[in-house]
């Protein structure tokens, strides 16, 4: 059998922040190599599967020797000789090696690297998106992070991501051009305002601003400056990542302390004044009441996205669906740790009528598998940073390649 695994080998490589991460090679009996690199987040939910790090002094505690050893030891011992194309069996075999509920012994970073490498080895020179598709496929609308704050930037801006959403176009290449032109337009807008400084982890600009709402104003100015119509051709999405500024006494934003209800009213005022189509993590990861209140009031006019709320976990998603906490979910492979579990959560969300957004992490690599997964699952949306820095453009460029054979651009918003 050509897809039987002959070897699995893990190694340490560097991610886009210069931190160690895991890379895995899976070689099958016919000589096919599947290689995958694992991303890492900065604003992580506490309910995520465990990213196994070494601690100690080397690599500032961020080494991955333990995770790599688990790839080359127990995982390789369990999987060599198995059929790489049996994705569900492969992933289940890895999970059976770990007795914890959150992959804390083997590490989600070890498992995910192997899971993705096996998928790549199975497909070989073929297309991953076609391999996983059930017949429906489309190029996703990109949510392009052009202004960074929060944990992704060294600035005073609380909101983590201000994204442009080029939904009003007939094709992905047109949409990508619009988003990229707006990115460059924002550079000019910020330079004119004397605010052009560094960039954040995901390639977006990271200015200091007097209020978070100023970020919305500058993004709208960039959209119009590039010659596009806000709200019709290009809209705005936010990742508030509010868990990062939630403290015991409330949400600390714009120099104020707010309750969940008050914060929700602030968002409502932004929805009134700006072409916002999506808000991610508007409340803390366990502030279920605020989520429900806001979604009931505003879910008819904005996509309310759970990231830290759900952490790509089917149990948390099931609870959110039951109580109406949101109407969309962000999907991050490393939050759950295997390809199989990721696909299950996507299917579960779609069955509930939820929007699905396939996402990168702030600590990224040149791996572009999320592009294929977003197309093959017909997710409709992808979030993969600014159209700058090769760790981000790798995903956009892969979508360009795929669009040569899949010319349906998702109809969103």
List the predicted regions and their residue ranges.
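Conserved phosphate/anionic-ligand binding catalytic regions in large, soluble enzymes, centered on
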Residues: 13-15, 24, 100-122, 141-158, ...
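Active-site-proximal beta-alpha loop/turn segments in soluble metabolic enzymes
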Residues: 161-172, 196-212, 241-254
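Structural signal for hydrophobic packing residues in well-ordered secondary-structure cores
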Residues: 28-30, 72, 76-83, 94, ...
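Short, Gly/Pro- and small/polar-rich lid/capping loops
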Residues: 1-22
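Metal- or metallocofactor-binding catalytic centers and their adjacent structured scaffolds
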Residues: 39-127, 131-132, 176, 204
